[in-house]
């Protein structure tokens, strides 16, 4: 099973916020996921990023590939990926 860390879109029309989830790469964007590891709200000023550092480290260690957007969010949140 190819596992990715990616964004799941939530919220209302024109007012999105995103949950950062670990999901099978074959699942739809807003479909089934394995675990929720945080959220991202681009609407607030400044935008809100909250990630569970332990879960991020665990999933990267177990081989989950973060998408490009999630990589940027991890860097912005100040989490060092070993």
From Swiss-Prot:
Q: Which domain of life is it from?
A: Bacteria
MF annotations from Gene Ontology: structural constituent of ribosome
Might you name a Gene Ontology BP term for this protein?
translation
Q: Which Gene3D superfamilies match?
A: 3.30.1320.10
Q: Which PROSITE patterns match?
A: RIBOSOMAL_S16
Give UniProt keywords alphabetically: Ribonucleoprotein, Ribosomal protein
This protein's GO cellular component annotations are: cytoplasm; small ribosomal subunit
Q: Belongs to which family? A: Belongs to the bacterial ribosomal protein bS16 family.
Q: Which HAMAP family match?
A: Ribosomal_bS16
* The protein, known as: Small ribosomal subunit protein bS16
Whose protein is this, by species?
A: Clostridium botulinum (strain ATCC 19397 / Type A)
Top-level taxonomy:
Bacteria, Bacillati, Bacillota, Clostridia, Eubacteriales
What's the encoding gene here?
A: rpsP
């Amino acid at each position: 099973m190819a596992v990715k860390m990616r964004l799941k879109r939530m919220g209302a029309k024109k007012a999105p916020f995103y949950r950062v989830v670990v999901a099978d790469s074959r699942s739809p964007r807003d479909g089934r996921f394995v675990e929720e590891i945080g959220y991202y709200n681009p609407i607030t000023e400044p935008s809100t990023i909250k990630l569970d550092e332990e879960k991020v480290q665990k999933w990267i260690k177990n081989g989950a590939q973060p998408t490009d957007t999630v990589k940027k969010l991890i860097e912005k949140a100040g989490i060092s990926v070993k």
